[in-house]
Amino acid sequence: MERPIRFIAEAIYENRLKPFTFSAGTNLNWKYMDNQYLGDVVSENGIRSLGIYGFAQIKGSLGQFKEGTSRLTYVAGFGLSNQSYRQGDEEFSFWLCRPKLTLAYSLSSSFQIRLGSELSQHISQIAMISDTRIRKNSMEWTVGNPSLKPNSRYENWVVFSFSKPRINTDFTLNYRINRHCNLAKYTRTEDDQFLYTQANQPHCNMLYLTNDTRFDIIPDHLIFSVNAGIYRFFNKGDEYSHCYTAYNYGGTLQGYWGKWTVMLYADSGWNFMEGENIGHNPPSLATSASYHIGDFDFTLYMHNPFMAHPKSYSAEIVNALLRKQVRGYDNSGGNLLRIGVAWNINRGKEYRKIQRNINNEERETGILK
């Protein structure tokens, strides 16, 4: 039985001055949950949280090329946030100063360098701060930790961009630092039960170098896009230290001939490490062809052809007390063939409405997932 209440409000001010544009704003997010769970899981959660954030920034440009584009653009700002929380006897109030600076300098109309640095706030999933305890199997339990606190995330990046009429490429170097973040923690009891929970621990950092390239083989007819990256993960817990290197890549080939559109997509999946968990999302292969005639679009789509039982996920736990490998397979995801027909019946004049509503949907339940 769920009884969540949530209130969100925000206000933004902007003034376009001559040398730069000044903007400021504030955001308030209040939430109360008093949920009761019965059956296999017995839990009653009374959680109150309040988040307040305010910021001010300036945005401008200096110098111009003959084409009219700016040589140097900048954004400099400062924010202050507070996150307070209470559940039973547990409560905290977390303050964080949040500066931000981004610079973009164009060496020419084709080559640009972008630099950035930002300090932000990261809040652990609400599902992990309940006081619930769930049995996973005969030897494993998942346990909530109401004493989890938010943490700061410090991110620095540099992007090298090159652009020509037929080719666009970006090289991105990024270093993300998560200090005192929530990471996995395993405990072995005297009766050989393994308790999994999360706790604030030293850091979980990521350094990566990626490239995104688009090449128009035949302009407006045949386009090839590719992305590739090297990712290095650094995980430091209270009782462990793990590093992991992953290589992720993918590509898309798109063709346009008259009323025909053809697409071929392939990737290596996403590989990562967080805490003591190594995750592997499997490779994917897809192709589609569509034909447009009048008000109709006919589409043929294939996903993972020639694969009867493709792997949907795999994970590995590398804890000193617990070694575990998990794999999942999806019969419905292999040799998938889908035929689609779309009929456009729009007639008359169309007017676009201005969307002024804040779209927020409450999906948090306060229980472990």
Name what the model sees in each region:
Residues 2-369:
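Exposed, low-structure sequence patches enriched in small/polar residues
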